[in-house]
């Protein structure tokens, strides 16, 4: 990351939840919309997602944000058993190594906790990134999300493998 001095990776704080939810919705609308229908986007990034339930999903997880100019520009979280749940980077900040840095941090946490592999359910949009990070596809899935069906990919990666 050439401009890493302006980017700060730090643990998620409860006060970050609203910014992360806003970033998630924006990213789904601006980035994932390339691979999803309008109905799928509206269901996935629904305005009915409640902030407190969103915030609670970060509890007891490895969770990080990347900050630039006091704004959240990326975030991720992983369960204590190694399931990478969410990984989103602002559309305006993609291609700067932020997602790679977040995943590398989770891989480090997993290795420290003796978690042998990380799994994720990657969107169509995110699948190429995860492949570049050394993940492999276990299976294609069709999952229901607030009345819409989305395609994603169960992927996994051993924690000790180097990314390409």
Task: Kindly label every feature range from the protein language model.
Residues 97:
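Conserved G/P- and acidic residue-centered "switch" motifs that form tight phosphate/ATP-binding loops
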Residues 126-127, 146:
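Short secondary-structure capping/turn micro-motifs that flank functional sites
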Residues 2-3, 148-164:
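Terminal substrate-recognition subdomain of acyl/acetyltransferases
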Residues 130, 135:
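Conserved active-site tyrosine of GNAT-family acetyltransferases
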Residues 5-8:
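Extreme N-terminal starter segment of soluble prokaryotic enzymes
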Residues 119-121, 136-154:
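Conserved catalytic-core motifs of GNAT/GCN5-like acyltransferases
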Residues 11-15, 22-92, 103-105, 109, ...:
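Acetyl-CoA-dependent GNAT
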């Amino acid at each position: 990351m050439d401009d890493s001095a302006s980017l700060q990776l730090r643990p998620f704080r409860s006060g970050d939840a609203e910014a992360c939810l806003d970033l998630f919705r924006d990213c789904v609308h601006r980035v994932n919309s390339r691979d999803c229908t309008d109905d799928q986007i509206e269901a996935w990034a629904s305005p009915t997602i409640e902030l407190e339930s969103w915030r609670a999903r970060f509890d007891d997880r490895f969770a990080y944000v990347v900050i630039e100019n006091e704004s959240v520009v990326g975030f991720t979280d992983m369960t204590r058993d190694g399931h990478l749940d969410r990984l989103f980077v602002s559309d305006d900040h993609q291609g700067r190594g932020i997602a790679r840095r977040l995943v590398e941090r989770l891989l480090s946490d997993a290795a420290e906790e003796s978690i042998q592999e990380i799994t994720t359910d990657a969107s169509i949009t995110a699948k190429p990134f995860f492949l570049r990070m050394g993940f492999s596809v276990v299976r294609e899935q069709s999952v229901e999300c607030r009345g819409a069906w989305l395609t994603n990919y169960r992927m996994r990666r051993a924690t000790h493998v180097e990314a390409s």
